[in-house]
Amino acid sequence: MYINGLFLLIFWCLGWGQFGFSNSLYLIIVLLIAILVAYTRRRAILGLTVFLLASAGQYDRVYSQFPYPWVSKDLRIHACVSKLDVTRSGISLLLSNAQIDIPIVKHDKRAKTMYGGLSKALAGQVKVTIYPYTKAAQPQLNGMNENLGLAGLIGHKVVLIVRLKGARNYQNPQHYDYLRWSQLAGQTASGYVRQWLSTGQACHGLNWPQLQLEQLRQRLWQALQGYAEIQSMAPPSVGIWGALVLGQTAALTAQQWRVLAATGTTHLLVISGLHVGLVAGLAMLLMRLLILPLGISSSLGIRLSAWVGLAVALVFALLSGFGLPAQRAVIMLTGLMWGAMWGLQLGFTQRLFIAFFVTLVLQPISASSLGFWLSYTAVLALGLVWYRCPSQQWWYRGMQLLAAQGALSLLLLPVIGLGTGYVSLVGPLVNMVLVPVFSLLLIPALLLISVTLMLTPLAQVFFRLVDVVLSGLWHGLETLTRLTWSQAFVGWIPLGVFGSVLIVSCICLLIRRWHWPLLMLLMPLIFFTLLKSQSPQARVPEHPHTQPPVFITLLDVGQGLSLWVRQGEHNMLYDLGNRYASGFNLVDAVILPEMLSQGVDQLDVLVISHWDMDHSGGLNTLLQQQTVKRLILPTEVKATRESGLVDYADKMSRCASTAWQNLWLDNANILMWRQIALAEYGLSGNDASCVILLNIYGRQVLIAGDIEAKAEAMLVALVGELDSVSLVSDVLIAPHHGSKTSSTADFLAKVRPSYVLISAGKANPYGHPHKKNTQAYWWHGSHWYNTARHGQILVVFTANGEYKVRPYLP
């Protein structure tokens, strides 16, 4: 194996992620020619050829797009159920071998959807959700074993009427790359079930053993939940148990994921290299003990133990759901144990390179995944400490454990910081304690209890003990997250400190000269991450005027609304986007990453226009993570939503019509605003949205919330009553996402906006913005932008009265 091939693989993979398949292929051809001219290393070229062939084989599957004309259409799908999860939002099915019946085009919208003889196979998998309120979509077990319950559906064919859409990212400079994740997972589309037509026979194929293991996994999870309910275990303890043993991460709440991220312990509850390697090690140790009395030679015993360890680790990974981290762990374990399995004498770097190469061959696009780099950096750190270390006394081995944890923390810190933008400052200390506890005590104990539970019922004391231990651990983690310094945004860390960590990491690698090529594993990641972070909106020029510029950002939160107003160190948010029953919310996914990227950790003002979930869904989530000085709630009272806001009573007020006043409490920066509470005039629902007018250096912005025609008419009628207020605005945040029941001609004639900014989800089921509205905007001389098409929209106002509109996408 030659390092040239390694470099080419890294740069091609990362280039694929950044520049597209074709451009990266041209790059690799140029590099290949350079190797042919400079060297004649056949094995490097052979390895590169294998990699390219594997990549080409995956290209169609990875980059297959769900046909846009099928979005939001009723489709009939024939598929095999390969995975099933019961979540807070409903029942989630993962379908494989999907065949779509193409609907016949309807000339009458009222006509029933008909399907012709044409069908198309979908590459990859399809994820659909069955919502409890859709009666026609509920699963039909068709006489299956009632003891199996829903788990009996796994491995069976189903015919469903579904609505699907392809994967799409929220188009903001800072966002979770859901599209890349779905490509890595091989997931082509997602949606929901409208009608369950039939349940067929069992699926037959090469993945039959995996389907049977998945069915067993689901049955074990149902049994574990049943025992836990009988013993009254705390929900967090049950979720942790399921995640550690069966990979049931869906049982963890959004709040639990935030705690894990803040304490740097996410890797402990996601089945990955730590868990798979531990299971393999325990199996190998048990096998060595079993064959010890048989007098088998040492070399044969090592080989036999390695094969058994790998087989047990593979079964455990399959039982855990065989997610991407588990897949990488099995591949890496195979590479690292390759020499032991075949009796070969391979060095650490050779084994690591084999694992690295095989991972890229099987999952080429994983090189742009943060988990890929974390996994190999962690193994590298452990190898630096343990490789070729002679046996020493127990205290020396203990020091090696501490050194290994220190190396992990040091080397993973820059990778995590560059990949996520955050670092956990308490993570190194927490992991110093919890990694040995989980590895040596907790995971083996939970595995033993779980296996025993399958064979015979256990006494209540075991469940109580597990509950006490897991609850205690969780309480400790939650306590650490309350520390103000527990987590930091990379942008807050001085460049010298961050650079020093990178330099020290490099020195640690260079201490052993034969490790220097592996240092290059980090360099492309750093280079491409920094290159990607230089988005056009991130480079906002400094303004020479005394008053700082005002930035108004309409965030892309899908079908919802969130507007961020920023001037100097002052910040206001208007609405917070949606929160779904699964726990996913736009505050965690979009709003907080955007704010933290600018170093913002507190809000001067938070305005909730009205109580619809697509505007207020993330309220509690944001209040748990950000300091809010003033909280302005809707005029209408909603007790069910306000019951958890008692702690903020001294900061709360309600939307009320006001005269012009300074938005900020100090006089250093001036930004005039006024509220118009339409609920005071007898309106309710959407029409009672809190309307905001901003006067920014002589320019006016109208934030209309979800008002519709009736409220618009009320606003027009009130023009003469509200201190001679004028509705004429340079920028209008479109009422009600541009629905056909809003943006009336009279309203637009009074506002006369130069720009209309629409917040709507792509291919949303409501048809927002309506075509008649966009035509009306043009007719009134307004330019309009839609977050569904243009992504995040930034408007910059400078003190000389000039302003510019900058969409994230052209």
Regions found by a protein language model. Give the residues of each.
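Non-globular, low-confidence helical/coil segments that flank catalytic cores
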Residues: 78, 138, 149-150, 154-163, ...
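Aromatic-rich juxtamembrane segments at the membrane interface
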Residues: 184-329, 338, 604-607, 700-705, ...
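Alpha-helical transmembrane segments of multi-pass integral membrane proteins
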Residues: 380-488, 754-759
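Alpha-helical transmembrane segments of polytopic membrane proteins
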Residues: 22-32, 374-375, 431-437, 493-497
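Membrane-interface helix/helix-cap signal primarily in integral membrane proteins
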Residues: 56-267, 584-585, 589-596, 602, ...
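N-terminal leader/targeting segments
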Residues: 1-77, 190, 194, 201-202, ...
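Hydrophobic alpha-helical segments
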Residues: 1-17, 301, 339-340, 453, ...
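Hydrophobic alpha-helical transmembrane segments in multi-pass membrane proteins
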Residues: 46-48, 191, 253-428, 490-540, ...
